[in-house]
Curated annotation (Swiss-Prot):
Cellular compartment(s): Secreted
Keywords, sorted A to Z: Disulfide bond, Hemostasis impairing toxin, Secreted, Signal, Toxin
Database matches in SUPFAM superfamilies: C-type lectin-like (SSF56436)
The keyword Zinc-finger is annotated on this UniProt entry: no
Gene Ontology molecular function terms on file: toxin activity
Paired cysteines (S-S): 27-38, 55-151, 126-143
Protein name, entry field: C-type lectin 9a
Organism: Crotalus adamanteus
Family of this protein: Belongs to the snaclec family.
Function recorded in the entry: Interferes with one step of hemostasis (modulation of platelet aggregation, or coagulation cascade, for example).
Domain C-type lectin, first and last residues per copy: 34-152
Record-linked SMART domains: CLECT
Length: 157
């Protein structure tokens, strides 16, 4: 009986060590992992430029969040729900660089826009996720307004 328990326990340890979480990286304490990136919502309202600067100071490669899929949008929306401030918007890393442009050609992290989720009639200036759409749709808001935000960075493996 003792041998059976010992062997069973040994097999359980081997199974758990091999199964893992599917992630080959660890995010710092307080950060959440999704698809090879670390994310964290911040309650301290900042304007868009200051929020982007703050994110870049948190970790190498840190920026305001870029959103590249429906799955990532859902994940970020869940993080946004954790923000304590009752603000209508939270910043994301998308901003029009010139008044003549309809939309920015890239996110603040330099990645191309391959996924869009504009709220109806919105596609200009600084973008935020709006509480009215459960933080799933993107809306324009004044770049100087102070809003909570979500940072994202690729961890070093």
């Amino acid at each position: 009986m003792g041998r059976f328990i010992f062997v069973s326990f040994g097999l359980l340890v081997v199974f758990l060590s091999l199964s893992g979480t599917g992630a080959d990286f660890d995010c710092p304490s307080g950060w959440s992992a999704y698809d090879q990136y670390c994310y964290k919502p911040f309650n301290e309202p900042q304007n868009w430029d200051d929020a982007e600067r703050f994110c870049s100071e948190q970790a190498k490669g840190g920026h305001l969040v870029s959103i590249e899929s429906d799955g990532e949008a859902d994940f970020v929306a869940q993080l946004a729900q954790k923000i304590d401030k009752p603000d209508i918007y939270i910043w994301i890393g998308l901003r029009v660089q010139g008044k003549e442009q309809q939309c920015s050609s890239e996110w603040s992290d330099g990645s191309s826009i391959i996924y869009v989720n504009w709220n109806k009639g919105e596609s200009q200036m600084c973008q935020g996720l709006t509480r009215w759409t459960n933080f799933l749709k993107w809306d324009y808001t004044d770049c100087q307004a102070k809003k909570p935000f979500v940072c994202k960075f690729p961890p070093e493996c």
